[in-house]
A protein has these predicted regions:
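ATP/Mg2+ or Mg2+-diphosphate-binding catalytic cores
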Residues: 164, 288-329
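Active-site acidic catalytic loop and adjacent metal/ATP-binding pocket
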Residues: 23-40, 44-45, 184-237
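An alpha-helical support segment within catalytic cores of ATP-dependent transferases
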Residues: 2-18, 123-206, 271, 328
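Activation segment
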Residues: 97, 221, 229-231, 244-247
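Residue-level signal for well-ordered alpha-helical scaffold segments within enzymatic catalytic domains
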Residues: 9, 64-71, 93, 117, ...
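Active-site activation/catalytic loop segments of kinase-like enzymes and analogous catalytic loops
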Residues: 234-268, 280-300
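ATP-binding pocket architecture of kinase catalytic cores
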Residues: 23-26, 30-157
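Short amphipathic alpha-helical segments and their helix-coil junctions
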Residues: 182-189, 220, 255-274
């Protein structure tokens, strides 16, 4: 079915007439999106990536999380309107706005409030799945990053940019990885393999950051892209938010975000300790994710400038080096 045909069917489910216009929009890494104009209303049509090698149910995961947010009265995310599981299309509320250019303390407080809001009534979310790549032990966090490091070593020197990436991986990233892995593996087995109690987990948008926020005309923020959302270790959620390569937070705003969010969760002392241990690990993981640009693109992936992605990987590696320097051996 074409996007227009799917849209017509989904609009009929919510009692709307056929669309006047279905306009493709710049998409994300794992989906395609269209603006749908219907009379005086606008909607968002979203197509979710799926393949035999990556069969994650992105539509189901996002839909369940958006329904949960609506059930607790949150209006910070788009309303889910209609879906077609057979074609992996969904019709969502269209949020008009642009990614925020300037960030201030009020934006940090807004994001912290959104995280608090979704975690205030966990009983409503007991049936939600875990996030994609959820990790509930130190060992699981380590193994997830190890898998990405191993994959990076498949990159070949097929161009000048690829050669620079290979050199960076060999001379910087692998040395950093080996040092950090040695530190973590020096922990007692019981500490590395201890499973985080369900009561200490959090609900997370997963890909949470200002790169997935839209500033509306009144200055307020709303958030999009919940296709990996679910239960997670709050340490991972907080680290990812402050270290998104697209929008790395300056130190003062990152500190404010942690100040406002750490008390939201049970056992903040243990959370502080996990943050200190896992922050450089996830900065290394983000460097690996940036370097995915050096692999052949998946069908939905936009082409990322290789020099930009290598620069971002270098930034993440530098941040990891700084974090490791803060922590005594």
């Amino acid at each position: 079915m074409t996007p227009t045909e799917v849209t017509t069917s989904l609009l009929a489910h919510i009692g709307k007439r056929a669309p006047q216009c279905v306009l493709p929009l710049p998409g994300g890494r794992n989906n395609r999106v269209w603006r749908v104009d219907c009379s005086t209303e606008a909607f968002l049509l979203k197509s979710y990536f799926w393949s035999e090698s990556d069969p994650r149910d992105r539509l189901g995961q996002e839909w369940a999380f958006l329904e949960f947010l609506r059930s607790i009265g949150s209006l910070k995310a788009p309303a889910p309107l209609a879906k077609d599981r057979s074609t992996r299309f969904a019709l969502l509320e269209f949020i008009s706005g642009n990614p925020p250019q300037e960030l201030g303390e009020s934006d940090i407080l807004d994001a912290a409030e959104f995280l608090a809001e979704m975690n205030a009534q966990p009983a409503f979310a007991k049936n939600l799945p875990s996030v994609s790549e959820a990790c509930f032990s130190i060992q699981a966090h380590l193994e997830t990053t190890a898998a990405r490091i191993d994959r990076l070593q498949q990159i070949q020197s097929t161009s000048e940019d690829h050669e620079k990436a290979v050199v960076f991986i060999r001379d910087t990233l692998l040395h950093l990885w080996h040092e950090l892995r040695k530190r973590i593996e020096a922990l007692p087995d019981s500490a590395r393999h201890e499973i985080l109690a369900p009561s200490e987990r959090c609900l997370s948008p997963s890909d949470f950051g200002f790169h997935n926020a839209l500033r509306q005309s009144d200055g307020s923020l709303r958030y999009v892209d919940f296709e990996y959302a679910g239960w997670d270790d709050p340490a991972k959620t907080l680290i990812d938010f402050t270290n998104q390569p697209d929008r790395v937070l300056p130190d003062n705003l990152a500190a404010l975000f942690l100040e406002k969010t750490i008390p939201l969760f049970r056992n903040p002392y243990a959370l502080h300790r996990r943050l200190a241990l896992l922050t450089p690990l996830y900065q290394i993981k983000w460097a690996c994710i940036c370097l995915n640009a050096f692999f052949p693109n998946r069908p939905f992936d936009p082409a990322h400038p290789l020099t930009l992605q290598l620069s971002r990987a270098n930034v993440m590696a530098s941040r990891a080096i700084n974090e490791i320097g803060k922590t005594p051996h």
